[in-house]
């Protein structure tokens, strides 16, 4: 019982941290897109 409670609290904390870091589900997509753009830009610079 105690292990389940601790696991539930930990899960809520992790989930809230992830959602807060990205602000919203839309923010997650923007973060991933920005990361892809940064990688693409770095690859283009490396080719030049």
Swiss-Prot record:
<dbReference type="Pfam" id="PF08085">
    <property type="entry name" value="Entericidin"/>
</dbReference>
<comment type="function">
    <text>Plays a role in the bacteriolysis. Is activated under conditions of high osmolarity by the factor sigma S. Entericidin A functions as an antidote.</text>
</comment>
<keyword id="KW-0564">Palmitate</keyword>
<keyword id="KW-1003">Cell membrane</keyword>
<keyword id="KW-0732">Signal</keyword>
<feature type="lipid moiety-binding region" description="S-diacylglycerol cysteine">
    <location>
        <position position="22"/>
    </location>
</feature>
<keyword id="KW-0472">Membrane</keyword>
<dbReference type="GO" id="GO:0009636">
    <property type="term" value="P:response to toxic substance"/>
</dbReference>
<feature type="signal peptide">
    <location>
        <begin position="1"/>
        <end position="21"/>
    </location>
</feature>
<dbReference type="GO" id="GO:0005886">
    <property type="term" value="C:plasma membrane"/>
</dbReference>
<comment type="similarity">
    <text>Belongs to the EcnA/EcnB lipoprotein family.</text>
</comment>
<dbReference type="InterPro" id="IPR012556">
    <property type="entry name" value="Entericidin"/>
</dbReference>
<feature type="lipid moiety-binding region" description="N-palmitoyl cysteine">
    <location>
        <position position="22"/>
    </location>
</feature>
<protein>
    <recommendedName>
        <fullName>Entericidin B</fullName>
    </recommendedName>
</protein>
<dbReference type="GO" id="GO:0016020">
    <property type="term" value="C:membrane"/>
</dbReference>
<keyword id="KW-0449">Lipoprotein</keyword>
């Amino acid at each position: 019982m105690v292990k389940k409670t601790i696991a539930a609290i930990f899960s809520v904390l992790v989930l809230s941290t992830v959602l807060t870091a990205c602000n919203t589900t839309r923010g997650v997509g923007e973060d991933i897109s920005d990361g892809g753009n940064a990688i693409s830009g770095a690859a283009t610079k490396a080719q030049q």
